[in-house]
């Protein structure tokens, strides 16, 4: 339950969201990760009911030429607040993974090409998941311990900064 505290009150800043058939109550961390180094450059913490695509423009630094994301970011380039060009005036390409149901259209050959492209996108996007793996696995951060968005932001800023230190200390796997 979301009210396991002394006051028997819910956190006013946290919200519920349904993912699949499972309900979650709390917060969501949206992160921007550098494609080459795998280090976090941006962290935004919101209530769990805030959709990923609404945070896209807040996660970009302005230096990007390509943006990768999971299917939660579909349509990010079409939004009013979308950043279309970076600081140097170059067009930003959005490479967002499709939903599995969208990959069933077309011939077998086109499906094979589509599957290969989606795999390439996922291999770059996996660097984001590695960061969450460090925070959840190494630091055992699986649920919130504090009430209030400000406390969550402080806690997650510390955890993701420590994750950056750990990831920066590891030898580069791509080389």
Q: Whereabouts are the PLM-identified features?
A:
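Short, surface-exposed, charge-dense and proline/glycine-enriched linear segments
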Residues: 16-17, 101-105, 171-175
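Composition- and surface-driven signal marking solvent-exposed, interaction-prone regions
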Residues: 45, 146-149, 172-175
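Helix-centered, glycine/charged polyanion-binding patches within enzymatic domains
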Residues: 61, 65-66, 71-150, 154
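C-terminal domain-tail junction helix/linker
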Residues: 157-160, 164-175
């Amino acid at each position: 339950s979301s009210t396991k505290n002394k006051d028997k009150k819910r956190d006013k800043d946290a919200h519920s969201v349904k993912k699949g058939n499972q309900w979650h109550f709390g917060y969501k961390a949206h992160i921007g990760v550098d494609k080459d180094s795998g280090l976090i450059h941006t962290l935004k913490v919101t209530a769990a009911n805030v959709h990923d695509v609404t945070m896209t423009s807040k996660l970009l630094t302005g230096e990007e030429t390509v943006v990768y994301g999971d299917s939660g970011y579909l349509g990010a380039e079409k939004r009013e607040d979308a950043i279309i060009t970076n600081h140097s005036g170059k067009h930003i390409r959005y490479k967002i993974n499709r939903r599995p149901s969208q990959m069933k259209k077309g011939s077998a050959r086109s499906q094979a090409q589509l599957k290969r492209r989606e795999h390439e996108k996922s291999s770059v996007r996996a660097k984001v998941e590695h960061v969450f793996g460090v925070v959840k696995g190494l630091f055992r951060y699986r649920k919130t311990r504090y009430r209030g968005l400000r406390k969550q932001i402080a806690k997650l800023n510390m955890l993701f900064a420590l994750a950056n230190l750990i990831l920066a200390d590891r030898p580069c796997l791509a080389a």
